Design a protein with these regions (language model features):
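Acidic donor-binding helix in nucleotide-sugar-dependent glycosyltransferases
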Residues: 37, 55, 182
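Catalytic P-loop NTPase motifs of RecA-like helicase/translocase cores
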Residues: 36, 60-61, 155, 171
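Cofactor-binding loop segments of dinucleotide-utilizing enzymes, especially the Rossmann-like FAD-
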Residues: 31, 56, 166
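Glycine-rich dinucleotide-binding loop and its adjacent helix/turn
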Residues: 1-45
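FAD-site-proximal beta/loop scaffold in flavoenzymes
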Residues: 5-24, 114-182
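A Rossmann-like FAD-binding core segment of flavoenzymes
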Residues: 47-151
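Short, electropositive alpha-helical surface patch
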Residues: 41-49, 178-184
Length: 184
């Protein structure tokens, strides 16, 4: 099963890459860590593609923990790359095509703005992939998939089991450097 999942993921990545090579405009929905990073990658690898970055919150990188100076710097970089940044608005409905598939479409935001793109990516609403842990962990699994840990990162109710990184319910921005700090 894991091999087939890996093959499927590889095929989707290859399809998205091929689509990005031909896309005139790309829509990225979500301007948090993942969305901003994705836009940076797209504008670097495919400089001919126009990019629209749509964020429901009033600012990019809406998660707490970012200094205003960093947000301004990122916004300036996005502007220099020609990215159209729209904040405080959401899609009225999802595009009629799967994310990462090249197929021109039009959508409207809840504020009535019409957007056109050739492909799109969803970069919001992440949840921790903890389903593989099974039913033994259901009582300590939150709605977003994270699991309860104590101050020493021990999994609550499971002696001898620790967790680090994105699957923990530690209140922090989920980043690789935080997972490395957990491991120490």
């Amino acid at each position: 099963h894991l091999e087939s999942s890996a093959a499927l993921a590889r095929a989707r990545i290859e399809r998205a890459h091929a689509g990005l090579e031909r896309a005139g405009r790309v829509l990225v929905v979500g301007a948090g860590d993942v969305g901003v990073e994705l836009v940076g990658e797209i504008t670097s690898a495919f400089p001919g593609a126009g990019v629209t970055l749509l964020e429901a919150c009033a600012r990019i990188l809406p998660n707490r923990g970012y200094l205003p100076e960093l947000r301004r710097s990122i916004a300036d970089q996005l502007e220099r790359r020609g990215v159209e940044v729209i904040t405080g608005d959401t899609l009225a409905w999802l595009p009629p095509v799967d994310p990462g598939v090249l197929s021109p479409f039009r959508v409207t935001t809840t504020k009535g703005r019409r957007l056109e793109a050739d492909t799109w990516f969803r970069a919001h609403g992440a949840s921790a992939a903890t389903g593989f842990l099974g039913e033994d962990y259901d009582e300590i699994r939150h709605y977003d998939g994270t699991i309860r840990v104590d101050e020493h990162l021990r999994v609550v109710g499971h002696p001898g089991v620790w967790a680090i990184g994105d699957i923990t319910d530690v209140r922090e921005t989920k980043r690789a450097d935080a997972a490395r700090a957990h491991a120490r």
